[in-house]
From Swiss-Prot:
It is found in: Plastid, Chloroplast. It catalyses: (9Z,12Z)-octadecadienoate + O2 = (13S)-hydroperoxy-(9Z,11E)-octadecadienoate; (9Z,12Z,15Z)-octadecatrienoate + O2 = (13S)-hydroperoxy-(9Z,11E,15Z)-octadecatrienoate. Its cofactor is Fe cation. It comes from Oryza sativa subsp. japonica (Rice). Residues 319-331 have a biased composition (Basic and acidic residues). This is Probable lipoxygenase 8, chloroplastic. The gene is CM-LOX2. Residues 1-67 form a transit peptide.
Amino acid sequence: MLRPQLNPSSSHHHTTTTSSSSSTQLYFASSSCIASLRRPSPPSLIAGAGCRTTRRRQQGRQRVVVRCASSSAASSASEAARRGTGSSDMAPAAVVKVKAVATIKVTVEGLLNSLRPSKAIDNIRDLIGRSLFLELVSSELEAKTGKKKATVHSYAHKVDDDDHGVVTYEADFDVPTGFGPIGAVVVTNELGQEMFLEDLNLTAGDGAGNSTVLPIRCNSWVQPKSSIDEGTPGKRIFFAKAYLPGQTPAGLRSYREEDLKQKRGNGAGQREADDRVYDYDVYNDLGNPDSNGDLARPVLGGSKQFPYPRRCRTGRPPSKKDPKSETRKGNVYVPRDEEFSEVKNAQFLLKTLQSVLHAAVPAAQSALIDNLSLNLPFPSFFVIDKLFEDGVELPGVEKLGFLHSIVPRLLELLRDSPGDKILLFDTPANVQKDKFAWLRDEEFARETLAGINPYAIELVREFPLKSKLDPAVYGPAESAITADLLEEQMRRVMTVEEAISQKRLFMLDFHDLFLPYVHKIRSLKHTTMYGSRTIFFLTDDGTLRLLAIELTRPASPSQPQWRQVFTPSTDTTKSWLWRMAKAHVRAHDAGHHELITHWLRTHCAVEPYIIAANRQLSEMHPIYQLLHPHFRYTMRINALARSRLISAAGIIELSFSPQKYSMELSSVAYDKLWRFDMEALPADLVRRGMAEEDPTAEHGLRLAIEDYPFANDGLLIWDAIKTWVQAYVARFYPDADSVAGDEELQAFWTEVRTKGHGDKKDAPWWPKLDSPESLAHTLTTIVWVAAAHHAAVNFGQYDFGGYFPNRPSIARTVMPVEEPVDGAAMERFLDNPDQALRECFPSQVQATVVMAVLDVLSTHSTDEEYLGGEQTRPWNSDAAVQAAYAGFTARLKEIEGVIDGRNKDRKLKNRCGAGILPYQLMKPFSDAGVTGMGIPNSTSI
């Protein structure tokens, strides 16, 4: 059996991609014809009975030539085709033998279901060959009536069941020679349980040993006919080829429309786990008011106060206490094909299990944590170090309670851990390089360019620094950072005016974003907040020097505004205050990173693209097939985030400074900062002043800091994506009219703007899809955000944040010098500044929970699909698309070498030097695990 190389773990339906003018295609003609595996026009033909097939080599290509030997046979076939009869009605001389091979992946759930009584019925169906009903669909209509041609149908019978959970079914068809091209296969699951259909391969032979295979990649769940709701079609269709809407063969148009209609749903009712319906809703499921009034949260999206992207509608009933909110009962629905593959799911559950034990078991299983009080600080830095030196033993199975049933399944995967201490935290990579790097100002500054939040730093373009907030509410707009103070810290080498003109001053500006929430956050227990500004100076060797930190508390009815500027100092007291000020800024940056750079810009903002694509782009649409790999697992991980991470009393609220106001802050950031046109990497760099357009420079940009590892490597990836997408778009859209006239494409983009991001629908900056160039740029931006942007801010989280003093998620105490000064707190600070800093850091529980979560989020699964990888190659596309993708893959491999070379270049001090972690987050490929590199196709964790 001839089969294409497929990814066996993907959980998505993806049809074979080919152009409208060429493909491997099964075509059954009624007159003289030629079939070729080259790219002829008209498409490839496989002739009917009475034809003779030969094979030739021509200019390095294999060519199959089929010539009709009998005109009478062709005439007979033509008459049979006109009758529209299926295979059972065909005369033997007027048919072509076609074999279909269906590959089914058996899941662990399926194996468990094999114990059900209904399995016996399924076995009987397998035995008599009535498990899977397949129908071949012609691309043509009946010439006389203009109606659909009758499908050619057959039951598939089980022929193989291997040791790897793959079951093979085969079906034989007698296809009329006048049937025309096979455009699709309709599948009906006659078994009592759902099945995961990996692929279908149709083989047509001439009886002389020559054959042509038409592969159809499915990777989709097919529900059993018995479980389909009344009124819902119980069949699934899988298309054989990509077509733009206007080029869709007449015989497939109604199928195309019906499949889209099914995925849109009717906007009513509660969605079930086996549905494949995509629809929109606001974020009204983050709170849980029915459980506790303190867990109520505002609805995000659909209002001027809290604008937000939309998420997938679940249809769960409204809350009893707040009808605007949705109840949180049961699992969060995502369309069936958006679920994790079982490999991904098992590994995610394994890591989550380890994480739960990391966070909860230490109290009983080690001497690490003697008190699980949420607010207990670490007693010493020595104890922090023991997180990586002493393991936490896995308790006996009998002590695991509800985990008892799943641990035996996972223990096999844990056997490679050293001894019994299988829950040992791995030492983060930056600590392995330099245990004390977190104390150095140089590392603090370097991580703004080569850490996990390289999107925050910006150029200082005016001085004095001024707030845009209302001074009547928040105090004087002008910053307390003076020119004299900065010039002193710059060692008087130049004036502030000169530094600005030479683009030597840079800033982390968390002032206006956080200041309006300072008092709200301070009203909560065991956390605090400031508005902050942090200033850096670009030295002659291309590194940044940390100059000053300004912390601001706005005025309140009971207190005046307080603000103070902190600087590096050799004075002992001031140096400890400096360390505490840096801890506050690091916590601000951690919140900005997790809530905005990571969650909002990659997870949350991408979900509307996925929903709109599935509602408006047919799965046979070339743009759907281009984008689909970049949407893998995103909806599922977002649903998990809503359930566990960003929900009321979830991990984010537990562990980050804004606590219950975390998601509100992300809504404020969406309102003030998010723009689609600024999500492209070049536009983002220019917006922050980190680059300026220069047609003579590489990538058309001149960076403000030459050694900016994220920008330098990221631009290589951006250009590679752009080149690939431009080639793909050019293959299908020759001119502006072809883009503007694509009704599915235009409906997709309209829905992204007016529904998915409906709170910004009238913004003037939305691009128009009116040319191949604008389409390619828009698609490049989507791919960049889903793949490279996410990789840059996700897969280094454990390396940089696993040792939490380097990147505390929360600052829990105010500065000891904040007025009015608490005399007792000041005395404790002076007596034991080390303890004061540890009390400001996350508590033991907060730190270990965050460490465990960052470990999970930073992990690549074994079934990861990487940018430019072989798993998502457009398998059956024409030569132009195949060559473009091969070039894309080759370029990404070249980029890996370029990045390796840069990391060894000692002139690049922001990525090479003693104790410095090399910048590898933009390296495209990776092994499984926590590696600090690798760009998956999608925002998949």
